[in-house]
């Protein structure tokens, strides 16, 4: 299957290793991975902060960038949720019904990584090896809007060497929420404190999730505590094998229009 990788803004700029891990994983599973070069933001941040009119051009660019893609996969429940629940609404609110319909059609072919692996490829054992004690945080958008359910847990349970421990209060928000963490810093910090306490109670070496944004928030807090628990994206765990991968051995998915 020809799979278009939607890297997302945050992954592209701050955690590119997550995008590369996603590409390697999909290629290992026999997919023809391409990275459309004109892709940009999905527009979520603009919509969530009230800039719906400004988001219209972003939605149009996204639809153009991925037009003709057989399937679109992103290592982010948050961005995929925006594509599913916001993009068509932005176009329709602006009176562009043609764009709204194109956005809806594209959303039907857009998947969060665990959804694509389990629902489309029918795979739970991706051949990964990760000998660490791990706990999983279900991010809000993946849990509530996309309803990915236990798909990430199914994938993690099949990873050889991985010890999966349940996270208490897993369904509770980590407190990031994009600009929420900036506009409501005290509340965000209190929520993060609760999340970190729950993570540390598991004695896990690694806290994983399907969104780099939440992992950045949780990981920043844990690093300040010098707790010894680190954050690793789900894609990076699933891409891991017995063969150590050093930066110079990593291959970036082919970029084709």
Language-model segments: residues:
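Iron-sulfur cluster-binding electron-transfer modules in prokaryotic oxidoreductases
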Residues: 1-257
């Amino acid at each position: 299957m020809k799979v278009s990788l939607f890297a997302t803004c945050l992954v592209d700029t701050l955690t590119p290793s997550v995008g590369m891990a996603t590409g390697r994983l999909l290629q290992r599973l026999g997919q023809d991975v391409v990275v459309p070069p004109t892709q940009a933001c999905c527009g979520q941040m603009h919509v969530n902060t009230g800039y719906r009119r400004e988001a219209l051009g972003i939605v149009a660019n996204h639809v153009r960038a991925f037009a003709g893609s057989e399937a679109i996969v992103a290592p982010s429940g948050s961005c995929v949720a925006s594509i599913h629940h916001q993009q068509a609404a932005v176009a329709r609110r602006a009176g562009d019904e043609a764009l709204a319909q194109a956005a809806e059609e594209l959303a039907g072919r857009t998947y969060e990584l665990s959804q694509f692996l389990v629902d489309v490829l029918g795979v739970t054992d991706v051949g990964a090896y990760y000998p660490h004690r791990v706990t999983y945080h279900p991010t809000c958008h993946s849990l509530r809007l996309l309803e990915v359910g236990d798909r990430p847990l199914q994938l993690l349970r099949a990873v050889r060497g991985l010890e999966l421990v349940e996270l208490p209060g897993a369904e509770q928000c980590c407190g990031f929420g994009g600009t929420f963490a900036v506009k409501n810093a005290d509340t965000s910090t209190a929520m993060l404190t609760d999340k970190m306490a729950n993570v540390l109670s598991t004695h896990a070496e690694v806290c994983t999730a399907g969104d780099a944004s939440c992992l950045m928030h949780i990981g920043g807090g844990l690093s300040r505590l010098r707790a010894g628990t680190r954050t690793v994206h789900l894609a990076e765990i699933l891409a891991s094998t017995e063969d150590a991968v050093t930066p110079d051995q990593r291959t970036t998915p082919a970029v084709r229009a």
